[in-house]
Regions:
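Short, Lys/Arg-rich, polar N-terminal cytosolic tail immediately upstream
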Residues: 1-11
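Hydrophobic, aromatic-rich membrane-embedded alpha-helical segments
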Residues: 12-51, 88
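Cytoplasmic membrane-interface segments at the C-terminal ends of transmembrane helices
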Residues: 31-38, 91-113
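Membrane-embedded alpha-helical segments of integral membrane proteins
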Residues: 47-102
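Internal/C-terminal transmembrane anchor helices
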Residues: 106-139
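Non-catalytic, solvent-exposed segments at the cell envelope interface
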Residues: 131-456
Length: 456
């Protein structure tokens, strides 16, 4: 007769081990406290509580948008990725140490082994997600943010030899040229579909937006010469004629707009139209209150058409429809000037949707994916927190909107060699600049807000 080997019942012990491990997964040290091991409990809990306290304090002292802006700055982002990895290791050690309770010698049973493995996976997953999004953000910076030599690796209509322009001093206005690039398959060359100068006053906490007509001709280049064709072709023209524009098309366009307005253009931001659609979708769409119906049976492209229309009243628009609203100009009573006003309207709505209600945090993954392949800027990444604070603080009531229309420009007539164009009137432009580009801390003078779709 052979003796039968009896295996001990490890179920109750495994359950206790797992419960302690789960507690330490929630907060390192809790499992050790459950196991009545005070010294290990304090060793794991105190650093964890200090870290949580620092995070809580940061959220109390800063808005979520500001914190996010600080966090995604390249230097800070690299540090946070390292901290994330260290916290993961710390939590896993705490989980394993709580699971291996010395009061219960012997190997854990199947329940304990499988349970511990599942718990390790659950603890690791959020840290892996943080690393994925962090690495994605860092990759985006490399593609979008050009360094001092303009060496960003992505974005529309890249300039092989672009160079940065003059930079603002401390407390000075920051002037950014925003370019919407139309490089669709029907185009033989990329054109700037929209040109908007955005001027930030960091002292007075105000914003001035000036839309430049894309059909503007005879624009000064800032070197004594004049660009005779339409301004929306300068970017592509300069990039194809490197001998005449050795600094590239973007710098040529910055210099031209700066000379036109008589103000320095410090930075640029380029977004192609397909990327704009994706950006709007990434923040969940934008809210627009349409004052006059728009309709164009021939409009199409970027997921809309043929034909597009919109009725009077509030609308929540996705990316394709927001782009259509900003671009349509062949509707009754509409033209390039009313179109420019609608473009500013959509930009403000995009800003509102991105920063209000903490939506920016949830929109970040899609937004990063959108801008990574479709945008480029030489804005310094280390000033992102400052710009984020301005974007969050400055609403529509502190934004001055200008569309460069008559008397700042005049018609080129019916027989102009470049077709339907407008010609700048320097004196009137200078008068506008004096009113809305005031010294830092001085509010811009009153200017009639453009009404892109006034009620009939």
């Amino acid at each position: 007769m052979h003796a039968r080997r009896v295996r001990p019942d490890t179920g109750p012990t495994d359950q206790r081990r797992l419960f302690a491990a789960i507690l330490s997964a929630i907060l390192p040290g809790l499992g050790q406290a459950f196991n009545r091991r005070r010294r290990p409990a304090a060793m794991f809990a105190i650093p964890s509580l200090v870290l949580l306290g620092v995070i809580w304090l940061l959220f109390q002292l800063n808005s979520s948008t500001m914190l996010l802006a600080h966090a995604i700055a390249p230097g800070t982002l690299q540090l946070l990725l390292v901290i994330n990895a260290l916290v993961l290791v710390w939590r896993l050690i705490a989980v394993f140490e709580a699971f291996v309770d010395r009061r219960y010698p012997g190997k854990p049973g199947r329940l304990g082994g499988v349970g511990l493995l599942v718990l390790i996976v659950l603890v690791t997953l959020p840290h892996a997600a943080i690393h994925f999004y962090g690495a994605s953000a860092f990759s985006t910076f490399e593609r979008v943010f050009a360094g001092p030599g303009g060496d960003a690796t992505g974005g529309p209509e890249d300039d092989p030899g672009s160079a940065t322009g003059p930079k603002p001093g401390v407390g000075e206005r920051v002037n950014v040229l925003l370019m919407g690039i139309d490089a669709g398959p029907s185009r033989t060359q990329a054109l700037t579909d929209s040109l908007i100068v955005i001027s930030l006053d960091p002292v007075g906490r105000t914003v001035t937006m000036v839309s430049i007509p894309r059909d503007l001709v005879d624009v000064p280049l800032g070197n004594g010469d004049t660009f005779a064709p339409k301004i929306n072709s300068l970017l592509g023209w300069a990039n194809r004629h490197e001998s005449e524009f050795p600094l590239g098309g973007t710098r040529a366009l910055e210099d031209a707009i700066g000379a036109l307005l008589g103000v320095p253009i410090h930075y640029y931001a380029k977004v192609d139209l397909a990327g704009f659609v994706t950006m709007v979708d990434a923040v969940g769409g934008v809210d627009i209150d349409v004052a006059r119906p728009l309709s164009d049976k021939n409009y199409g492209g970027f997921g809309v058409g043929p034909g597009w229309s919109i009725t009077v009243g509030p609308h929540h628009l996705d990316g394709a429809n927001a782009l259509a609203y900003a671009r349509i100009r062949r509707s009754t009573g509409e033209n390039d000037f009313t179109r420019a006003g609608r473009q500013q309207e959509v930009l403000i709505a995009l800003r509102d949707q991105a920063v209000e209600g903490g939506n920016f945090l949830f929109s970040l993954p899609g937004l990063l994916d959108a801008v990574g392949d479709t945008a480029r800027t030489d804005l310094p990444a280390d000033r992102l927190p400052e710009f984020a604070a301005l974007a969050e603080e400055i609403g529509g009531e502190r934004t001055t909107q200008v569309v460069m229309t008559s008397p700042m420009v005049k018609s080129g007539g019916k027989n102009h060699p470049y077709g339907s164009v407008v010609i700048p009137v320097p004196k009137r432009i200078a008068e506008m600049v004096a009113i809305v580009f005031t010294k830092p801390g001085t509010p811009p003078g009153p200017w009639p807000t453009p009404k892109p779709t006034p009620k009939p």
